[in-house]
């Protein structure tokens, strides 16, 4: 048995628990951000916020289903948003289930118009630092992922 195999055996349960914890934390963060009114949904809306006030953005979620993987325009937008977030020290994750995300944050805005959930930004509600335990857990998760060169980790949302 090699060292890699031994390490692989130890990290599988740990990484599964870590992933589940991150998914639960993301679920809590999305609900909290939505209640406080500091959630921006949509690729174009998010790009506007990132352009105008990137220092106020604390977290970014990119979401795409399997059928979205073939959408070249969406993938280009994702690449640009990822680069911008990395450049501005904004934690970023990917979610592979847009339907589950829609169940958490809803599918329409105040007027009932459908919302693009491919990109979600979470901003500070005011100048004071927003202390949310779920945000802190996710920041730690992202930091740990970056330490193993996983710059945009995938998170599975809980059922």
Swiss-Prot record:
Protein name: Growth arrest and DNA damage-inducible protein GADD45 gamma
UniProt-listed GO biological process terms: apoptotic process; cell differentiation; regulation of cell cycle
Function: Involved in the regulation of growth and apoptosis. Mediates activation of stress-responsive MTK1/MEKK4 MAPKKK.
A Gene Ontology cellular-component term: cytoplasm
Family, as annotated: Belongs to the GADD45 family.
Region of interest called Homodimerization, as start-end residue ranges on this chain: 43-86
Record note on quaternary structure: Undergoes concentration-dependent homodimerization, which is required for growth inhibititory activity and enhances interaction with PCNA. Interacts with GADD45GIP1. Interacts with PCNA.
Keyword Phosphoprotein: no
Pfam family for this entry, one: Ribosomal_L7Ae
Acyltransferase listed as a keyword: no
Keywords: Apoptosis, Developmental protein, Differentiation
Domains as described in the record: Two central helices mediate homodimerization through parallel packing.
InterPro entries the record matches: GADD45, Ribosomal_eL30-like_sf, Ribosomal_eL8/eL30/eS12/Gad45
Domain of life: Eukaryota
């Amino acid at each position: 048995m090699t060292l890699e195999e031994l390490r692989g055996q130890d990290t599988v349960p740990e990484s599964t628990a870590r992933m589940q914890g991150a998914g639960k934390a993301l679920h809590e963060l999305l609900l909290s951000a939505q209640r406080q009114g500091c959630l921006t949904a949509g690729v174009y809306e998010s790009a506007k916020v990132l352009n105008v006030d990137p220092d106020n953005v604390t977290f970014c979620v990119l979401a795409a289903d399997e059928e979205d993987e073939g959408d070249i325009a969406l993938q280009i937008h994702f690449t640009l948003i990822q680069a911008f977030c990395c450049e501005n020290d904004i934690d970023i994750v990917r979610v592979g289930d847009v339907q589950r995300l829609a169940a958490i944050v809803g599918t329409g805005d105040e007027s009932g118009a459908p919302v693009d959930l491919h990109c979600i930004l979470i901003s500070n509600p005011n100048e004071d630092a927003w202390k949310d335990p779920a945000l802190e857990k996710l920041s730690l998760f992202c930091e740990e992922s970056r330490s193993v060169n996983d710059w945009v980790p995938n998170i599975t949302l809980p059922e």
